[in-house]
Swiss-Prot record:
The keyword Transmembrane applies. It is found in: Cell membrane. This is Efflux pump ustT. Keywords: Cell membrane, Membrane, Transmembrane, Transmembrane helix, Transport.
């Protein structure tokens, strides 16, 4: 992942621990008067509150590896899980149609089977991501929350495995309850929020986009390798990658426990003391459990009021709104598999190659195109970092819109592949949008804002999952070109996201 580094001297990574005050991008547009008194340097520039015991490169690598391990465990079961779901639905459908068990299954690509598959998978994704709407988790230590969230994700996958292992005991729709386990720690939302906040705390402006890109590159490597690998293993037995993913997740939890530093959020130690202090005092002065909970809730509300000045900035709100539909880019992966399998009668192992294609293009974008564009816009066009990030985000948005629309119109496998390629060129939308947003927010509010961003991402997923599932059902019922109706919806939503980014003023 070193190929994602922009053309800046490598010693910048080690120098930031000693000289970070020259990063003028950290002059915030938000909360300037209040925060200036607490976190500015003598020359008036904001100084990011970071843990200087850890090198930014180390934090970026650890966050990327944690993402890689977690995402491999999640991605390797994408195709096998769809195959298992489809088999259970198909068997039940033809048993009901024939009126007798034991008769052979027919074509599993028929509309009733695929509609039920879209319904179950779409609502499962929604319920899985409802626990992701947490705000205050990062106040209790990033490492602790990260570990608990990973355990919750593991238990969630185990529940799905139990339901599908005993289809005669549990109805398949019982997989919708897998989200309950992700209440433990906040699920994938907390993993994402903690990793990105750790990077934002430790990396200066000129390295931030690269660090974010490394995390996204880890996700892409997982997709590039694990999705087709899981599909290939599913040809032998779909349960092989399912059990393998659980083992890999356990290893990931052990890795995070040993390697991830126990870093508190930037600015967590305030004038009134650290979170640990107020928790201790709560236990001393309020011995009952109920009163302790009440004290913690009041403290959370007070802290939110202190940190909520960024809510009044319209430009920040516009950027955050664009993240609401950004997660659709990730969710389209599962839709693409089922769409290609249903429309062109592909097996899931063949359809999974589309995911690998997208991941390969994404890696090229992060390794070559983004650094090149950044260099050209800064050196040749003399744009500052904030404007540069905005322009690249707009380009990414256009690619997402065009790619989604082409996939909607795809009448042949070649057109679908072309649309997927164009769509993949815009995958870095969230990378540069995060950097764009970070450059406009006071460092003291980074943890809070990034938790808000993650909430917007998963809020979009919670609403978008059943929405795309329903549109896929409609498309399958209408047939023809309308099978790709979810991609038309995605194109419309990405257009709204591009409009929000364009409307945000960059100073």
């Amino acid at each position: 992942m070193s190929g994602t580094s922009p053309p800046t001297p490598k010693d910048h990574i080690t120098m930031v621990d000693h000289d970070y005050s020259d990063c003028s991008e950290d002059v915030s547009l938000i909360g300037a008067d209040r925060e200036h008194r607490r976190s500015s340097t003598p020359d008036g520039l904001y100084q990011h509150k970071i843990n200087r015991h850890y090198n930014p490169l180390y934090i970026a690598v650890v966050a990327s590896l944690t993402f890689l391990i977690t995402d491999i465990a999640g991605q390797i079961i994408v195709a096998p899980r769809l195959a298992i779901f489809e088999h259970i639905i198909c068997k039940a459908y033809y048993t009901q149609v024939s009126g007798a068990a034991g008769t052979g299954m027919g074509d599993c690509k028929v509309e009733p089977v695929q509609s039920e598959l879209a319904l179950i998978n779409g609502w499962r994704e929604m319920f899985d991501n409802i626990p992701g709407t947490s705000y205050t988790l990062d106040r209790f230590g990033r490492k602790k929350v990260l570990l608990i969230a990973m355990v919750g994700c593991l238990l969630s996958d185990i529940w799905v495995g139990v339901v599908t292992w005993f289809p005669d005991t549990f109805p398949l729709r019982a997989v919708w309850f897998s989200g309950i386990w992700q209440l433990i720690g906040g699920g994938g939302a907390s993993i994402s929020s903690m990793a990105f906040a750790m990077i934002a705390d430790s990396c200066p402006a000129d390295l931030r986009t690269t660090a974010f890109s490394q995390v996204h590159a880890a996700v892409l490597v997982a997709e590039l390798v694990s999705v087709p690998a899981g599909a290939a293993l599913a040809n032998f037995n779909p349960w092989i990658p399912v059990f393998g993913a659980a083992i890999f997740m356990v290893l990931g939890i052990l890795f995070a426990y040993v390697v991830v530093p126990d870093v508190r959020p930037a600015g967590s130690k305030r004038e009134g003391g650290s979170d640990g202090d107020f928790l201790s005092s709560a236990q001393e002065s309020h011995p009952t459990w109920l009163m302790s909970i009440h004290h913690r809730w009041r403290k959370i509300v007070d802290e939110f009021r202190k940190d909520s000045s960024w809510i009044r900035d319209v430009n920040v709100l516009l950027i955050m709104a664009s993240f609401f539909v950004c997660q659709l880019g990730r969710m389209i992966s599962g839709i693409t598999l089922q769409y290609a399998a249903a429309k062109f009668h592909w097996k899931f192992d063949k359809a999974s190659l589309l995911v690998s294609l997208r991941a390969g293009v994404n890696l090229f974008v992060l390794a070559a195109i983004i650094p090149a564009l950044s260099y050209i816009l800064v050196k040749r066009f003399k744009l500052n970092d904030v404007v540069k990030d905005k322009r690249i985000t707009q380009i990414n948005g256009v690619c997402l819109i065009i790619g989604s629309f082409v996939m909607f119109l795809a009448a042949s496998p070649g057109t679908l592949v072309f649309g997927q390629t164009v769509f993949a060129l815009g995958f870095a939308f969230s990378v540069t949008a995060r950097s764009f947003l970070t450059g406009m927010v006071d460092p003291m509010h980074i943890g809070t804002v990034f938790t808000g961003v993650t909430t917007m991402l998963y809020g979009g997923l919670v609403i978008g999952s059943p929405m795309l599932a329903k549109t896929l059902q409609w498309g399958l019922q209408l047939g023809g070109i309308w099978v790709g109706l979810p991609f038309l919806l995605a194109a419309v939503l990405f257009t709204l996201a591009l409009g929000a980014i364009s409307a945000a003023r960059s100073y």
